[in-house]
């Protein structure tokens, strides 16, 4: 683990002050809901609270917010520790790394270590808010917390962080405007390349290329969802992805 601590800089797209403002806003909402400790599993909320945004959400990870803490904690697997050190604004000691031995090694689970961390900090009797409907917060995650912390008062946080994210800062709005410019270019490419006789996958390739290239000022990256391109009778099913079939004249296409 120590090798990651020599990384010389953090690559943050928001200032430390903005992250601190977000934390204070979330902590105020926690107080209002009677939550002393928040375990946030939603990958977007983890990013909002810490800056961490690696593509690692498919396995257990979370941000942990104590109602009186100066920083949240970021709980990630060892393989992804470097990403947390690079992308988050947190001090090294607030990045908590669990061993790879917990991966696919049932009945062991990363939240076994999370429970131990909570006990070590004497938080096991607190009122703990959980994101009960968050993607990838599995039933097993919940069971580990429930069984491991029998004296805690567990409650649904009711999308607390999601509501905090609702009001955007000037910097966030600026980034959204940049993203809109990239989306506009992607839509123009789609209008240009979708024609009868063209394969759907070829059109998607051009659209993705445009989205990744971005603008002269802002580069793009992968989109938040696969490029959906239902066409013909597929337009009755909104979330179909492209195939190698060709576009047919007179058929509708959803971009």
Q: Where in the sequence are the language-model features?
A:
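Short catalytic-site patches enriched in acidic/histidine residues
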Residues: 46-56, 158-163, 167, 198-255
């Amino acid at each position: 683990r120590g090798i990651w601590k020599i990384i010389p800089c953090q690559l943050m797209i928001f200032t430390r002050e903005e992250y601190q403002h977000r934390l204070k806003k979330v902590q105020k909402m926690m107080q209002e809901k009677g939550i002393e400790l928040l375990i946030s599993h939603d990958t977007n909320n983890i990013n909002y609270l810490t800056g961490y945004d690696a593509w690692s959400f498919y396995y257990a990870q979370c941000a942990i917010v104590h109602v009186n803490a100066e920083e949240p904690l970021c709980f990630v697997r060892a393989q992804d520790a470097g990403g947390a050190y690079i992308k988050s604004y947190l001090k090294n000691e607030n990045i908590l790394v669990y061993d790879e031995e917990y991966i696919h090694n049932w009945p062991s689970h990363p939240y076994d270590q999370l429970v131990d961390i909570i006990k070590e900090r004497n938080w096991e009797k607190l009122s703990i808010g959980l994101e009960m409907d968050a993607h990838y917060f599995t039933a097993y995650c919940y069971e580990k917390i429930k069984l491991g912390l029998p004296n805690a008062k567990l409650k649904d946080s009711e999308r607390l962080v999601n509501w905090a994210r609702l009001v955007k800062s000037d910097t966030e709005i600026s980034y959204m405007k940049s993203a809109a410019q990239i989306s506009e270019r992607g839509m123009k490419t789609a209008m240009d390349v979708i024609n009868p006789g063209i394969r759907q996958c070829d059109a998607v390739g051009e659209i993705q290329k445009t989205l990744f290239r971005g603008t002269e000022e802002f580069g793009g990256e992968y989109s938040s969802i696969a490029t959906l391109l239902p066409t013909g009778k597929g337009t009755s099913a909104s979330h179909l992805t492209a195939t190698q079939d060709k576009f047919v004249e007179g058929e509708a296409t959803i971009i």
